[in-house]
Amino acid sequence: MYQPDFPPVPFRLGLYPVVDSVAWIERLLEAGVRTLQLRIKDRRDSEVEDDVIAAIALGRRYHARLFINDYWQLAIKHQAYGVHLGQEDLETTDLSAIRQAGLRLGVSTHDDMEIDVALAARPSYIALGHVFPTQTKQMPSAPQGLEQLARHIQRLADYPTVAIGGISLEKAPGVLATGVGSIAVVSAITQAADWRAATDQLLALAGAGDE
């Protein structure tokens, strides 16, 4: 039963692009995306704070669900919609501070054991990956494939879920057929020959999420 310790999110978050710049955030919001994540890696808080502020302001302007990856203290300081954390971040993050600030929490998982860890934290949503091989990020685990993804979805029942990892426009229908509430994409948009057309097609498949 879905009883998160953090503010809830809709079961269907829809198309969920993960991007590394404010420019991409703005483009995608203008294109109709309403769930997205700013993921900037390996920089100090002071180096990313201006980007976080700008991204949060854009998210508010478009009434979007903007998650900040990793920089949870900045997300709290500037009142983001939510924070997304990897498994390795759970132990070093003050989850109670995120909860008390009223931010939503998403957590990455890669297998059943990590799903157990995520469920213990009772986040707003659980990300399941990586579904297919991906070049975007070095992954220590093997791709899960659609069969494993479907099993996780069945196990999590009414918990909001996000599939991530190697999801292309061609593979998106099969991923969505598992019943997952959202698909997170990176290169399917940012490396597309025509990013706007790719975004439109992915939105047509996955939707922009429930209100």
Swiss-Prot record:
Enzyme Commission identifier(s): 2.5.1.3
GO CC entries: cytoplasm
Root EC class: transferase
Q: Which domain of life is it from?
A: Bacteria
Q: Where are the transmembrane segments?
A: none
Q: Which InterPro entries match?
A: Aldolase_TIM, ThiamineP_synth_sf, ThiamineP_synth_TenI, TMP_synthase
Residues engaged in binding 4-amino-2-methyl-5-(diphosphooxymethyl)pyrimidine: 37-41, 69, 108, 137
Give the pathway listed in the UniProt entry for this protein: Cofactor biosynthesis; thiamine diphosphate biosynthesis; thiamine phosphate from 4-amino-2-methyl-5-diphosphomethylpyrimidine and 4-methyl-5-(2-phosphoethyl)-thiazole: step 1/1
Question: Cofactor stoichiometry and binding?
Answer: Binds 1 Mg(2+) ion per subunit.
An example of a GO molecular function for this protein is:
magnesium ion binding
Catalysed reactions, semicolon-separated: 2-[(2R,5Z)-2-carboxy-4-methylthiazol-5(2H)-ylidene]ethyl phosphate + 4-amino-2-methyl-5-(diphosphooxymethyl)pyrimidine + 2 H(+) = thiamine phosphate + CO2 + diphosphate; 2-(2-carboxy-4-methylthiazol-5-yl)ethyl phosphate + 4-amino-2-methyl-5-(diphosphooxymethyl)pyrimidine + 2 H(+) = thiamine phosphate + CO2 + diphosphate; 4-methyl-5-(2-phosphooxyethyl)-thiazole + 4-amino-2-methyl-5-(diphosphooxymethyl)pyrimidine + H(+) = thiamine phosphate + diphosphate
Which HAMAP family does the record cross-reference, listed alphabetically?
A: TMP_synthase (MF_00097)
Q: What is this protein called?
A: Thiamine-phosphate synthase
* Organism of provenance: Klebsiella pneumoniae subsp. pneumoniae (strain ATCC 700721 / MGH 78578)
